[in-house]
């Protein structure tokens, strides 16, 4: 399901800081304007021992102070170094809860069952939601009008074609990500 992460954060993945010009951190590129501060609070509350360097940042009222904050980036690396597995799992859980689970529920309410789809399809939807938001992901899946009889391969093709049409600036990424999704599907 997480085949798309290399397109989000590259090889640094969970330890990545300062992505998108100092705006984002982690495997999912949590952006200071949206999810970075909520993630920091979640991580610190979930495991204050592993994430002890996050204590001062978890008190922030606004994520704006995290923008291009090299002291915060050092804290991020320290947390990762202390327990990379736990910190990575926190990122996965936070992202899934905030960017995938709600999309799946909204699609189910609209009569589109993606819970029974392959991990490749779920990953493609997850990727869409991470990059463009939950509402955009839900609307994209609705727009391609998948039926229960639509194969996962066809679902992926339609979704990535829709994504390229909607966001042509990223067409090259989506072409590569589509290939990765098919590889995941065919495993």
Regions found by a protein language model. Give the residues of each.
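Cell-wall polysaccharide-cleaving catalytic domain and substrate-binding groove, primarily
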Residues: 1-115, 120-187
